[in-house]
């Protein structure tokens, strides 16, 4: 009896099989790693290593080890590059997975599981990517040999149409059917539309251990239950109604035609028999191109009307990110356009016959070969669909991540009282490549650890200091709008060029590390930062009166009206200074023939008036961190969003992307919190957001893209068990606010306001 007790409570024998890994990170430019896996039982010291597989990012080992696992033991499986492990301690690390005791029990006897590789610790700067496939078997389930497993099937992401792979909170993979709105554990093999009965309704939050309906009906509610049959019929009717396609679906293309899309998102139609292609939809007769659009009703959801540079109308499909000349309402409602009344049948037949493939000769005048569709807007081609800013930003982040060193940190320690000068001294003594390292900021005298929140607050406070017009580096562009521009009289500070260099570096660091500057410049400033020329239109947002005056000069005959020369004046600290727009411009009059040159030179001078050296210093600092060529895909408005984020706070977006911890939407704390937020003005909402996240700015994608210590992390309201005399606490690295269970709305409002306005500093719990 005693022996059996020892066996029951002592170490358990498990067989761990390390099958393969996939998509490992490539850290060398010219060669691939030699991966091997190392298995360590934390607690007992058992250690095993697999064979080394040469020159691959997708190694296959298929080796097993018998382990004795205690009640509190954990298993660490790490992947290493054999080529580098001898260089120094920790070299060659490619990722690891740590299985705690609860994870071991959950994964045991569940077959092969794909696990994401992670870093050794949260502060580790090594880049990690990929997955490893392992299985755990109990001793009584271990056979003489394991089944042959096709590793490629474990990583096959080509799911049938209508399916999506997701993970539960515990990490188990489930498959979502978008047609039947259901989920299942088994990997699907047929398109979603062929599944008539759902695995699990999406509206139900079913625990992953709850029995579900299997093909043979062995688990769950019996298949012949009349309630199930009734629900199934009703659900099928609902699906048929929701998936109906005959009302507003375009008719099939004529025989021999295919619809294709260029790499730029331009839709065209190819006639496979003749090899010619056209922008025009062959389903729509050409004589219907001038039909009254009001008769067709509104555009389908996600569509937009735009004009080319030559004024031709085209249509943008934001759902599929494509563009086309054909009105989508024409092809979708063709039967209504061609048959407006019973008497219109003959006209319909004639119109349809004119668009048949037999009349290709007539259409050939506007077609080109498939591989040579013209791209010049003057050729009336459909404009390219510009990828949305989020996608372009994602590409920029990927480019920047490749430049980040694998080791080391950019450490900055400053005091809150001297944040500007101390940051200036530390940042300016670093090399540009040091600024690419993982940013670690510490406020002197505070214990907070920087997992992103401290750096965000540092940039927030530093922005307010370095962009403050009080220091003379910048000035407001207009009295009524608080956008900034470079102060042409900044030379009163003899070190001003070095400070502009510093400002450029800080802006670059914010973009590189995924943070934001709390301030805004004029749009022409961002245009200059991109290296694009300034035009008269850029003047309108900066100086509307001057813009109107220059437009009047261009639009009217100034002969005998204006007595201007190519020389302008401006006031510098009470002194009138003259500036010649061209050599000897003081003696050159502005005439009807030279007014365009005068306006062009005036605009360039207005934006670069006395700031050429300052701007070049700032641009140099910015491009030291963010190379100029990486920004070619962006325009000035997009660059403004990248540098400054979204200043406008959308409360509805905030609410819908907030996580609740130890509370529900119906909890008083949650209701009172949002009531307080709605009562705040924009400035106070920004202060609240800065208090909780470290930044008053919202990411481009909205609140769903708030960043935490290790990737996106939603804004979180956490009701804690604490004295109601305490103030709310914020965890900026996790975007979480801890709120005690206050007795009333007024008390929550006062405590929250006090925390926002009267507190500062970081500590460690």
Swiss-Prot record:
Polar residues composition bias: residue spans: 351-369
One Pfam family matching this protein: WW
Repeat keyword on record: yes
Region spans: Disordered: 341-375
Active site: 733
InterPro entries tied to this protein: C2_dom, C2_domain_sf, E3_ub_ligase_SMURF1, E3_ubiq-protein_ligase, HECT_dom, Hect_E3_ubiquitin_ligase, WW_dom, WW_dom_sf
Chief location of this protein within or outside the cell: nucleus
Residue stretches making up the WW domain: 157-190, 251-284, 297-330
Pathway annotation from the record: Protein modification; protein ubiquitination
Cellular-component GO terms for this entry: cytoplasm; membrane raft; nucleus; plasma membrane
Protein's UniProt name: E3 ubiquitin-protein ligase SMURF2
The entry's keywords: Cell membrane, Cytoplasm, Membrane, Nucleus, Repeat, Transferase, Ubl conjugation pathway
GO molecular function, one term: SMAD binding
